[in-house]
Amino acid sequence: MLDIKRKQDHIEINLTKNVESGLSSGFESVQFVHNALPEINYSSIDTTTTFLNKILQAPILISSMTGGTPRARDINCRLAAAAQKAGIAMGLGSMRTLLTEPSTLDTFTVRNNAPDIVLLANIGAVQLNYGVTPKQCQYLVDSVKADALILHLNVLQELTQPEGDKNWENLLPKIKEVVNYLSVPVIIKEVGFGLSKKTAKQFIDIGVKILDVAGSGGTSWSQVEAYRATNSLQNRIASSFINWGIPTLDSLKMVREASKDISVIASGGLKSGIDGAKAIRMGADIFGLAGPFLKAADVSENLVSEEIQLIIEQLKITMMCTGSRTINNLKKAELRMNHIPL
């Protein structure tokens, strides 16, 4: 029940408090060079891409948010239905509660709403140090008919959480066991503090093929935990890390330096389809957002669909104004960083 209460707290805090990182994602330092004569019909702009052997209508992921509570069930169902209509991907929130509270399964079960989407199951990697087995990870995947499993890395959040899991020793070999055991790919994802080149290489070396950089610039989970603190000392400790992390743009560059061959998801502080286009240009295969979708999904499916359409139109207009008919063209679009052409 403690896990369920924590999830309730997380939803409420994210919706009602300012929990943004004190750092920027870095994308404001990158600008596309405007193409005044693109020689393209807007109707021919093609945002489709392939991810996990499925076609996405746009390279967008609704990043992992929640699960385990009635409110989370409604949010996930609305997100999934809107993702199905738009043809984009979706990640589920941490599914640890499902292993201890089987009755929470319906808060994660969205395939009826979204039979065709790329769907990602999710659990904290550190749980492998607390008894979660590869077999249980496969159960999480099977229970929601997921296309992959996210193992998220949230060390700073755990260390600033009153009930956090603090033993991260010898975790990499256990992650490797899961990578080798599962019938679907494992995605390694940070939660808002970024992946370095060194860390990315550690995962690539054990066979991980997909990394989500989830850099700083958006939600700071240390700030979320500051609001959950049960005393002033805990609050002060968590609050002091407001400027911690690797900005998303920097993390994206680092991960791409580690490998040109893996799939990379850019998330963390992206605010629009314009930011998403910049992420694609800088090396991401798809990009993820959470905050804008959470607020919409707490209200209605229609608002989620409107938010998705906004991001897609921003992406398409950016593609048009850079002369990029396809996502592959966008990856080569002309950029300026700090007023210096790239």
Curated annotation (Swiss-Prot):
What EC number(s) is this enzyme filed under? Answer: 5.3.3.2
Give binding positions for substrate. Answer: R6, K7, S94, M95, R96, Q157
Cofactors demanded by this protein: FMN; NADPH; Mg(2+)
Give me the residues that bind Mg(2+), please.
E158
Query: Subunit arrangement?
Result: Homooctamer. Dimer of tetramers.
PANTHER family per the UniProt record, alphabetical = ISOPENTENYL-DIPHOSPHATE DELTA-ISOMERASE
Q: What is this protein called?
A: Isopentenyl-diphosphate delta-isomerase
Q: What is the lineage of its organism?
A: Bacteria, Pseudomonadati, Pseudomonadota, Alphaproteobacteria, Rickettsiales
Name the encoding gene, please.
Answer: fni
